[in-house]
């Protein structure tokens, strides 16, 4: 469970996992039919794929648990199914929590390996976020905002390192609120894309 006050999730059967993988593919087809130009798979922030990836939340003892390769099986199967369901020319992105900020949890080294596997399967860009899978996370960064324990660009280093180590395109997120800051990230080669959310809503 996410916290000790939460109910313990039921372990999915292999058939249920297969059904969910197919559901992702079906959703991708609907997205194409609806006119979307990019598909992004959300593998971050405690969502289902993130729970499979994390050695903290994944307590399985079958082919979907244990080693990094096993824990990555569900998201990798999902990528394969979606990639096969959409046009070859359609960009496929994947969002990951590059670190859980928890000792013994998901970290940057595992994210780098996952990104290599995703690149091999046809993912075009990794959207590099972090955290969201444990209430015990401790962000080792300068704190600009005590309420969120974050600072401008605090996740950019993840995008930079994954890009450098794998060659895959990366997107940077996380308190990138000034145009000059965004341009600096791109000009330094720390990321290929800046994802903007709240600033568009504010303006």
Regions found by a protein language model. Give the residues of each.
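Flavin-dependent oxidoreductase catalytic cores
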Residues: 1-203
